[in-house]
């Protein structure tokens, strides 16, 4: 499969609509409807210039819509999107499906987002993961990466990134690393690989929005003034149609508090749990703000690094359970793939082949 060269551009965020009573909303809707009808527009056809002027009234699609019959060992499920764009005043059309894979790289992060035309990698595991991760991505037929992003400069997030960048070389469009300058050999290797590639290097800025085919992704946080590297993680919200994902890197409760105060729309269907499920992440108030149906934890098995770091923490798992959030863990299921058609999410899990076969 070929991956086209797509360029990002900053887009205007949706205008916030003032809240009114239901009666006023209905009256406004009917008024616009009759104006459009008198102008010769058919039912359901709205001129593009009117989109920002209309506040759509629709029933929310909250809540799971039943189970997919999948592998009983993986707990495959299908759920509708909580983030109903009709309620927010926009209708987004997408074509095809988008895959978001939380690749099993042990006590580390590597997230691959792709469809038939575009691909984006967020983090790349530890140093030994670089070549196996590259082999796995290539085994999917992906020969071009639109974006490669390192959420912060810890080895378990950028360790394998130099291998990925070197392997794809001229087939990487954009590279984004944290502005927090690192001092480790791992960091220097990634910077050297980025400098040697033909990719344009992007500077992360909170609020900036980019495109990935029909998907958009926005940087919500990248504060390098935080005292800890984890707290300066680049936090990204990805939206595809009426579905959304929040990727938090190793964000802590301090980062989460800043996000809650930022004014950004945090509500997302899927939450990548911060810092491998550590006790210092995933606060109750943050879960209230995000309101995810699904949470994914990228972590090593308890017999290995996970036990050393006590990840995921019992307290974090309890908070997720108390909020009624379905949890998927890479140490239990392997690589976790969530596929979106823009309206519903399908979850599957499998052992990752990293030998390129």
What are these regions, as identified by a protein language model?
Residues 2-10, 25, 33-357:
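Non-globular, low-confidence helical/coil segments that flank catalytic cores
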Residues 15-33:
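N-terminal Sec-pathway targeting helices
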């Amino acid at each position: 499969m070929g991956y086209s060269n797509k360029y990002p551009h900053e887009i205007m965020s949706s205008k916030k609509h003032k809240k009114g009573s239901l009666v006023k909303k209905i009256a406004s809707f009917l008024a616009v409807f009759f104006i459009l009808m008198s102008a010769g527009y058919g039912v359901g056809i709205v001129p593009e210039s009117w989109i920002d002027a209309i506040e759509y009234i629709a029933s929310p699609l909250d809540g799971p819509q039943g189970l997919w019959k999948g592998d009983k060992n993986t707990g495959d499920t299908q759920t509708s999107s909580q983030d109903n764009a009709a309620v927010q005043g926009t209708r987004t059309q997408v074509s095809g499906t988008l895959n978001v894979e939380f690749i099993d790289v042990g006590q580390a992060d590597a997230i691959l987002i792709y469809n038939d035309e575009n691909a984006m990698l967020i983090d790349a595991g530890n140093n030994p993961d670089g070549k196996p991760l590259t082999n796995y991505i290539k085994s999917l037929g992906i020969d071009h990466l639109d974006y490669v992003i390192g959420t912060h400069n810890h080895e378990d997030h950028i360790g394998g990134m130099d291998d990925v960048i070197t392997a794809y070389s001229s087939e990487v469009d954009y590279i984004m690393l944290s502005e927090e300058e690192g001092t480790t050999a791992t960091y220097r290797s990634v910077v050297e690989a980025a400098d040697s590639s033909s990719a344009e290097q992007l500077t992360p800025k909170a609020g900036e929005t980019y495109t990935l085919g029909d998907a958009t992704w926005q940087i919500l946080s990248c504060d390098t003034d935080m005292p800890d590297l984890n707290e300066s993680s680049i936090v990204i919200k990805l939206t595809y149609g009426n579905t959304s994902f929040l990727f938090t890197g190793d964000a802590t409760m301090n980062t989460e508090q800043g996000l809650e105060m930022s004014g950004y729309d945090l509500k997302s269907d899927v939450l990548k749990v911060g810092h491998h499920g550590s006790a210092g992440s995933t606060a109750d108030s943050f879960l209230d703000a995000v309101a995810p149906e699904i949470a994914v934890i990228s972590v090593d098995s308890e017999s290995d690094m996970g036990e050393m770091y006590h990840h995921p923490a019992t307290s974090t798992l309890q908070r997720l359970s108390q909020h009624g959030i379905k949890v998927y863990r890479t140490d239990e299921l392997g690589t976790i793939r969530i596929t979106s058609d823009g309206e519903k999410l399908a979850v599957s899990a499998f052992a990752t082949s990293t030998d390129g076969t």
